[in-house]
């Protein structure tokens, strides 16, 4: 089976049984189809099993991968689907040309306004609410409001009272001088309802129902009860679509197994038009990692600052405000908090998928190590040991080793190391120390030697390890280096005297195994480093300076990167990032003692 088919098969197994939308992509990573589903896993599986009509068969033949977005209801899925189709215009979807395809409810701009359902938006002619997922939904909402509020119904003002007046669904402004303030109050209540605020209208109906019941008018009371139930069924709060047109980005995140996934929903004109997903290994606390991420997210000119940024309430608003120059909102309740929660839920789903896919791929690892050995020109590496270092500015440096046997993690043979002989952040010397300690003990205790050693790094790391093995310990074990790209993803395998790139296909089983090994050793090292920091406390020269607490220390390290850079900074540099003048003076003096 071709690799992309196997990847799709693996991913199908970890898709949740929840409502949502999915995006099918071709070999060029272009979205070719957008769909929705009540249960994502069932719908997605249906594409890759059984017979299909000619159009679907052509579609499936072009699919190379898929993505999905979890929503909270089927209605949300439908609304999101409409937006995604408009955004990507996939060729296998029936394209919707413009906003005229969507039904809206309109309150006309007249002395005595009317309620209309329309697909045409004309600015300056009234207030528009929507879009609604279909005409039926919009018409049902209008009918409900017509029954509750005696709003004008006629296109043109007639010269006599019509049927609507006689059945209590119009105040008759065509004949009577209707109090404009009463009409304005109705308009306000209707507007609130169409904006998603249904408490006022429900309270009013409950009061009417109670009054009718006390008057023994049970038929009227039943009518009000039915209206209340109808509203509760109709007003399934929409998180994906909002009548609030504020331009905003919504952030949510999830953390697991040393990794953090951050999801960003881009909300424009009340619609979620795009999603960004980022996976990063945790090197700090989750809060500190988020502050660094969001600062870079907008500072790298990849994303335009919106009017509002919505973030979880556990984060420090002032810290985010120091790096993001726009309004920061931490919703406590309602649809806005629901949206933040939905972003976090999608982040959790993405993390779970990552780990589930890794776990399911273990059964195919023998093929991976055979392929790896062939491409490197060595014997099949049954036992692989991989090393990675972890520290922050040289503080509490540690290293970790993971062992893979037959391409599977052998966790009982994982090892942790605290760096003992190296002062400061020196990755090369730290790696030499750990390798020396590890294989001196292996030789002394007669433990099994690995068939391949992998270091997280490049030629410098490899040469240091080879020197220790050959010239100090008399061992001849293949040593390879794994490098990452700027997105912190496994990029290439280096091997040989000149650290040449091993020609592995990025979609091969061997490359995927290397990616997993690098992720695992990094996770293990980061987790150990975090545990070490929690025990000893992150100690630095900044801890002894009055006025510098944990927040300001994080701000300084993020702004300058190192103590060395802080020593080169001027008093004005400190003040420019928000450090008070008296604290800045004290900091400047202490750094130059």
Curated annotation (Swiss-Prot):
Entry function = The UvrABC repair system catalyzes the recognition and processing of DNA lesions. UvrC both incises the 5' and 3' sides of the lesion. The N-terminal half is responsible for the 3' incision and the C-terminal half is responsible for the 5' incision.
Keywords annotated in UniProt: Cytoplasm, DNA damage, DNA excision, DNA repair, Excision nuclease, SOS response
Q: Which family does it belong to?
A: Belongs to the UvrC family.
Source organism per entry reads Staphylococcus aureus (strain bovine RF122 / ET3-1)
InterPro entries from the entry? GIY-YIG_endonuc, GIY-YIG_endonuc_sf, GIY-YIG_UvrC_Cho, RuvA_2-like, UVR_dom, UVR_dom_sf, UvrABC_protein_C, UvrC
- Domain GIY-YIG, which positions? 17-94
Chief subcellular location equals cytoplasm
Entries under HAMAP family matching the protein: UvrC
Q: What are the residue boundaries of the UVR domain, all occurrences included? A: 199-234
Note one Pfam family from the annotation.
Answer: UVR
Q: Name one GO biological process term.
A: SOS response
Q: What does the record note on quaternary structure?
A: Interacts with UvrB in an incision complex.
Q: Where in the cell is it found?
A: Cytoplasm
Protein name stated in the entry: UvrABC system protein C
This protein's GO cellular component annotations are: cytoplasm; excinuclease repair complex
């Amino acid at each position: 089976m071709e690799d992309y088919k196997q990847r799709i098969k693996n991913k199908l197994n970890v898709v949740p049984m929840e409502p949502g939308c999915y995006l099918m992509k071709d070999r060029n990573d272009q979205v070719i189809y957008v769909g929705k589903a009540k249960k994502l896993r069932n719908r997605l599986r249906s594409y890759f099993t059984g017979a299909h009509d000619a159009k679907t068969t052509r579609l499936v033949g072009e699919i190379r991968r898929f993505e999905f977005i979890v929503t909270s209801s089927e209605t949300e899925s439908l609304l999101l689907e409409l937006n995604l189709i408009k955004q990507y215009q996939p060729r296998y979807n029936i394209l919707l040309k413009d906003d005229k395809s969507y039904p809206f409810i309109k309150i006309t701009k007249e002395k005595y306004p009317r309620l209309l359902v329309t697909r045409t938006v004309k600015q300056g002619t009234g207030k528009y609410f929507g879009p609604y997922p279909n005409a039926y939904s919009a018409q049902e909402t209008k009918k409900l409001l017509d029954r509750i509020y005696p709003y004008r119904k006629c296109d043109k003002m007639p010269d006599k009272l019509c049927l609507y007046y006689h059945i209590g669904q119009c105040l008759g402004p065509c004949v009577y001088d209707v109090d404009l303030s009463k009409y304005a109050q109705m308009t306000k209540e209707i507007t609130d309802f169409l904006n998603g605020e249904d408490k006022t209208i429900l309270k009013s109906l409950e009061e009417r129902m109670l009054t009718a019941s006390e008057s023994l008018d049970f038929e009227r009371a039943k009518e009000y009860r039915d209206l209340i139930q109808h509203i509760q069924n109709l007003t399934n709060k929409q998180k994906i679509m909002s009548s609030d047109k504020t331009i905003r980005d919504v952030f949510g995140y999830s953390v697991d197994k040393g990794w953090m996934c951050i999801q960003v929903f881009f909300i424009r004109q009340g619609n979620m038009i795009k999603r960004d997903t980022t996976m990063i290994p945790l090197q700090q606390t989750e809060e500190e990692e988020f502050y660094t991420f969001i600062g870079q997210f907008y500072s790298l000119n990849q994303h335009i600052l919106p009017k509002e940024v919505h973030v979880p309430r556990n984060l420090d608003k002032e810290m985010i405000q120091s790096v993001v120059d726009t309004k920061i909102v931490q919703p406590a309740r309602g649809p806005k908090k629901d949206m933040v929660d939905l972003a976090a839920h999608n982040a959790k789903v993405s993390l779970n998928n990552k780990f589930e896919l890794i776990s399911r791929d273990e059964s195919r690892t023998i093929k991976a190590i055979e392929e790896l050995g062939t491409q490197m020109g060595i014997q099949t590496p049954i036992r692989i040991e991989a090393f990675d270092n972890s520290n922050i500015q040289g503080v509490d440096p540690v290293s970790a080793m993971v062992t893979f046997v037959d391409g599977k993690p052998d966790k009982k043979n994982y090892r942790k190391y605290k760096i003992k002989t190296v002062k400061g952040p020196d990755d090369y010397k730290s790696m030499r120390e750990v390798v020396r300690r590890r294989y001196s003990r292996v030789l002394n205790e007669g433990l099994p030697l690995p068939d391949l050693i992998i270091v997280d790094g490049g030629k410098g790391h490899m040469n240091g390890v080879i020197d220790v093995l050959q010239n100090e310990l008399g061992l001849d074990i293949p040593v390879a280096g794994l490098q990452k790209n700027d997105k912190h993803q496994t990029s290439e395998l280096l091997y040989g005297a000149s650290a040449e790139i091993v020609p592995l296909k990025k979609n091969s089983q061997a490359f995927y195994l290397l990616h997993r090994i690098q992720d695992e050793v990094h996770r293990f090292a980061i987790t150990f480093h975090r545990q070490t920091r929690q025990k000893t406390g992150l100690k630095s020269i900044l801890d002894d300076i009055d006025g510098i607490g944990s927040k300001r220390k994080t701000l300084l390290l993020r702004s300058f990167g190192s103590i060395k850079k802080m020593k080169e900074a001027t008093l004005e540099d400190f003040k420019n990032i928000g450090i008070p003048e008296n604290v800045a003076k004290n900091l400047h003096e202490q750094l130059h003692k």
